Amino acid sequence: MALAPTQLRATAKPPIGLIPPSTQTDWHLTVGRTTVTIDGKTLNAPTVNHTVPGPMLRFKEGETISITVSNTLSEETSIHWHGLRVPACMDGVPGLSFHGIAPGESFTYRFPIKQNGTYWYHSHSNMQEAQGLIGPIIIDPATPEPNPCDRDYVIMLGEWTDVSPAEIVSNMKMQDDYYNFRQRSTASLPAQSQHDGGVIPALKSRLMWSGMNMSATDISDVSGVIYTYTMNAIAPDTGWEGLFRAGERIRLRFINSATMTLFDVRIPGLEMTVIAADGNPVEPVPIDEFRIGVAETYDVIVQPHENHAYTLFAQSEDRTGYALGTLTPQTGLRAPIPPMDPRPVRTMVDMGMDMRDMDMKNMPGMAMPDDKMTSDKMATMPSMAGMPQPDSTHHTMHSMTMPHMAMPGMAMEHSMNMANMPGMTQHGMSSMPGMQPGMSMGEPMGDIHKTSPQHHIMPGMTMPHAHHMMGGMNMQAMDMSHMSMADMPGTAMPKTSPPPSALEVDDPGPPPLNVENQNVATHPIDRLGDPGDGLSNTNRRVLTYTNLRALTPSPDPRPPSREIILHLTGNMERYIWGFNGRKFSESGPIRLRLNERVRFTLINDTMMEHPIHLHGFWSELENGHGAYNPRKHTIISQPGSTMSFLMTADEPGMWAFHCHLLYHMDLGMFRTVSVA
């Protein structure tokens, strides 16, 4: 029986942060079973070279490398090089880009290294990734390192449990909040009532969530009830250590290799400077904290000037536990561990709803007095204290109302009857994104919602980009034959705008409410400037996606020729996930033309974060920096939000496109992208 990696580490000296460059181009990895014990939880885990995580692979940009993987398991395996731009046949997804590695067989991956930065590898077979088949990748730049540091550490954040993935899935299919032991209760009602401004608002909040068969406290599907959160596979009671000397510059390469957990990372008393996101350099951003989604990577630099220990604190998003480490000038020296923040509580914003105009009696399963929810009453709703304040860059109730955003000549009050607009027919409106089955033409549509300088969303429209406002509408469903844009009051088009026909739009419209889709976000908003649930009022500088600006412009300056709109959907009660209301088994491939420039727009109809990963390509997140939009391989889609990214389909083949919460992917939130 092999000795557990954590047992080996317990007697080893802490790493000193000096990683010699590698000249190795031929690698051999063995996948097999190793008995691993972490925090008293023992598992006969699938491992690479008998360790969790697997060995660090260090490459150099411009080289061609060869990696032979031998499978000693009794089942198929594979390795995917997460974030690396490789040929499709080397991407490592069985059944899609290759046949997988059968028991007793080997496969040699061979590909050129076209990039540099921090990445990782993991299995794409049989949920082996959830049990430890992971490892880090560092790629040195072909040119001299632009951010030289005295020390360099890899920090892999993860979870550990001895409960099998199959059992976890079975439990959540039986009861979606099976691992949520922090439900609201009768005992918590007085405190909630005090927070919400009275018993009635608190009860209304609970009734709304009950009517939707959802829980406002269900933040993470799987929690610290069974997970031990780890840092480099070391439990918090031991904690990872890294040495330093005062005054040194230290590079920390954070990789979220977890199965289901988003982490909020900080080092109390020490400023971090973000220098790279998903391996790509960004303009330096000084921060106190950042949220890292599953599969994301961030490189930060710290420079401690005091000769004492600093705690690396990575709390789970649901605040049921944390991973722990220490930067220390001497072995065994520790710093205080900060308390965890209060647990986040979801609001109707996370459901993509217009909170001012909600009529609770019309919600499924609700029978309430005729008392509409107004903006004045929203101040008493649960967790509104967690909403950003007016001087922040995030959405407030005032900014969501946005009376100053009304278009000249257009009455935008929420009693507006769209049926009176020329050419607007009942058939046309019913097919517009955001319209619900049975919604009449004269029903309230709500106000325009502010998103970002480049994103304005009108209820009933998908308009993530002002320069192609009409492109997000289902133009075929509208009778426009006798109507020009110039005829619409207050909608004179700038002469520099491209004609609406310049952008081909693939928009399926909102998915139906059925067994596979529990909710439609009628008012999705841009949340790129929002640090995430639970982080808005911490008095700490928290990284947001709007802070990320690439150091170099996009290599492809072309505008997109096509926009593909995808809804992220699911049914929490049945634990089913998908795109556009369909599971993977019910969906065909997304077909792209070779070298096509495409915009993907994601509308999150669920109350959960989804880290979305497109294999094989950079996703250029449209966060307002134009040519300097950051290039990422994994992007968090926040609940009730809309966002978009550009990509260039410059590599032919079949590619995976999925949520990187493993159980969401396994239960349907997976698509294929075909480039030919």
Language-model-detected regions and their locations in the chain:
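A short beta-strand micro-motif common to beta-rich folds, especially ectodomain repeats
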Residues: 121-124, 309-316, 655-660
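Histidine-centered copper-binding motifs that mark active-site loops
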Residues: 2-294, 301, 331-448, 454-459, ...
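Surface-exposed, short loops/turns at beta-strand junctions within beta-sandwich domains
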Residues: 114-115, 304-306, 650-651
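Intrinsically disordered, low-complexity acidic Ser/Thr-rich regulatory segments
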Residues: 204-232, 472-549
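Short, acidic/polar linear motifs in exposed loop/turn regions
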Residues: 73, 258-259, 306, 606-608
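Active-site pocket scaffolds in enzymes
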Residues: 26, 39-40, 83, 89-98, ...
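A conserved active-site cap/scaffold subdomain adjacent to cofactor or substrate pockets
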Residues: 255, 299-311
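Short acidic/polar inter-strand loop motif in beta-rich domains
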Residues: 127-133, 309, 316-324, 663-668
